[in-house]
């Protein structure tokens, strides 16, 4: 569903608008063949992957250490900046701080991705961080930056983000 709205953000609306009168139509990012092949590739890992569509903090509290030791937590919380304009359910600064504390105590490998903001870098300052550029193509074309934050049990060297991008493409 991420590909049917504006960068996965519900309040942004669908690409091209409800009337599909914009320059970009819904199929600009919803390429059936490409998405189908990605789903098939991902499906080959289905016995090893569990997806949870819930709040990151609630997930950590619910699962925490009850998962196998080799469980990787990948958390993608709402953006820090402009969240109230992008999401129906967004975090307040105190929620981001509470999540950072819970993640720091998590005894499992973890990775968190965020919009690159000084407040986020400070909250996760004890952990390795990798900033990377991102092109926003829905709406006005713009460049931004995001940050990947790696827990102490993640053993990676070099630019992990560029490696992941190669796999995901």
Residue ranges and their predicted role:
Residues 1-74, 78, 82-84, 117:
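SAM-dependent nucleic-acid methyltransferase catalytic core
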Residues 88, 92-169:
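Long, positively charged, glycine-interspersed low-complexity recognition regions
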